[in-house]
Design a protein with these regions (language model features):
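Short amphipathic, basic-aromatic surface patches that mediate peripheral association
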Residues: 1, 97-110
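Short, ordered, surface-exposed loop/turn motifs in non-cytosolic proteins
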Residues: 1-17
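Short, acidic Ser/Thr/Gly-rich low-complexity loop/linker segments typical of extracellular
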Residues: 14-29
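A short, solvent-exposed beta-strand micro-motif common in secreted/extracellular proteins
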Residues: 30-51
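Structured interaction patches on ligand/partner-binding surfaces of diverse proteins
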Residues: 49-74, 181-182
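Structural beta-strand segments of beta-rich domains
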Residues: 88-94
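Beta-strand-rich modules
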Residues: 160-184
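Short beta-strand elements
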Residues: 181-200
Length: 200
């Protein structure tokens, strides 16, 4: 089943002369597990994730096999500071930065690829742009497609976490979208880790 905030794993079973790709979806955290495969050699490729394309890697499966892929995310998003208001104010401001990753050798992308940022808030520790995993009235979206990537990378953005209730626990993270992901069947965001806050 197609998963939001995940990637697809393509496997080519090399025991066949003209193999049909076997496909399954990783979890949102990038881990994947498939217990329905036979031992043998496979070419394995992670694809349709928020990262630049990678070459297939040859994997020999025998019993429980662990294999890690190294990928380069489209964007690196960092929360630089969380600023809390006075006690009772229920005010929280998040400062964050967005940077492009180094484009892999042999690839060319434009100068206006960062299209959107989102400060997401939820009352549960699962926070995502998809599957109703954020509270809209507490979250903020910025359209960045009119700015150059260079100007975006030079800034520290500040967004409020809106409409909070003093003393309540929330979970926040920042997401950013690159137009490099638009050829995917579903836009893929790069995220910061989830951070727990308590509204002052």
């Amino acid at each position: 089943t197609k998963q939001a905030d995940a990637c697809r794993i393509d496997l080519m079973d090399l025991s066949y002369e003209n193999p049909t790709p076997l496909q399954f979806w990783a979890k949102a955290d990038g881990t994947f597990r498939n217990v329905a495969l036979f031992s043998g050699d496979y070419d394995v490729t992670p694809t349709e994730g928020p990262f630049f394309p990678v070459e297939a890697e040859r994997v020999h499966l025998k019993g429980v096999t662990k294999h890690d892929f190294k990928v380069t995310p489209f964007l690196k998003v960092n929360i630089e500071e969380i600023v809390y208001g006075e006690p009772g104010s229920a005010e929280v401001t998040v400062k964050y930065t967005i940077r492009r990753s180094t484009t892999p050798e042999g690839m060319t992308i434009g100068q206006k690829t960062i299209s959107e940022s989102r400060l997401l808030c939820n009352i549960y520790p699962v926070v995502s742009c998809y599957n109703s995993c954020y509270i809209e009235e507490n979250s903020t979206t910025k359209v960045l497609s009119r700015s150059t990537d260079a100007s975006i990378e030079s800034r520290v953005y500040e967004d409020p976490v809106k409409n909070l209730k003093s003393g309540q626990k929330y979970y926040i993270r920042v997401a950013a979208l690159s137009s490099c992901s638009y050829n995917s069947t579903l836009k893929r965001y790069n995220y910061t880790p989830v951070i727990e806050i308590v509204a002052p």
